[in-house]
């Protein structure tokens, strides 16, 4: 009885390739004894040299990919914003790069070589990051709830102000670079509805509000080191405390806090300003003393 012979139609090159693959797999697994015993010294040295060259080439390729991804993480604004909070995967960086290029293509090519637009983009990202840090500080360090009036009004005001600045920068894209200190005084500030005075306590303040931003802009450009404080309409305490007229009534930590936030043209009426010289007023308010000067000044 004849046995069925296998089909030898395949070429000898395929068989040699299979043997070579088995040898390479043996090299990768570290079992070199069985693979090298059947080869001549010249063939084994060639295999080892090829494997060594392949490892060097692979390492260089990985280094180029990692360097390119690091540059993309630094250049793409959305990836640069998230790099401090969480570790980005390679696929996420590539996706953010594609989205950024699509956005630039949709904008008609504007921003490719516009250094001012890129600086404004990074500035808005920095402002948003500082806003998130303020919210985290008030909730974690100070222990304020998410429904606390101080936290809600401050965060909503800063968020509204950031939106206004982004809209203003988009409308006036043809202007030159405007520094932070003088940029806040050029555009009238529209107060957030939560920051408006209630029950007629701020009638005098609302009457002077149309001309107030212009005066604040002039004062900010002429005296950038002076904090922009508004005079209170009355001396009594209401639901919203009036702003202290002179900086001498503030405690030293709050003085440094106001000096560091002098560029922001929002009213400090939502903060309970406590002074060591008035212990009775501090006792009546029932609010804990919060020395924010050193923390905010550090930023």
From Swiss-Prot:
Residues 49-104 form the bHLH domain. Gene3D superfamilies: 6.10.250.980, Helix-loop-helix DNA-binding domain. The keyword Transferase does not apply. Its main location: nucleus. One of its GO terms (biological process) is regulation of vasculogenesis. One of its GO terms (cellular component) is cytoplasm. A motif (YRPW motif) lies at residues 289-292. May self-associate. Interacts with HES1, NCOR1 and SIN3A. Interacts with GATA4, GATA6 and HDAC1 and HEYL. Interacts with CCDC89/BOIP. Transcriptional repressor which binds preferentially to the canonical E box sequence 5'-CACGTG-3'. Downstream effector of Notch signaling required for cardiovascular development. Specifically required for the Notch-induced endocardial epithelial to mesenchymal transition, which is itself criticial for cardiac valve and septum development. May be required in conjunction with HEY2 to specify arterial cell fate or identity. Promotes maintenance of neuronal precursor cells and glial versus neuronal fate specification. This is Hairy/enhancer-of-split related with YRPW motif protein 1. The lineage of its organism: Eukaryota, Metazoa, Chordata, Craniata, Vertebrata. The gene is Hey1.
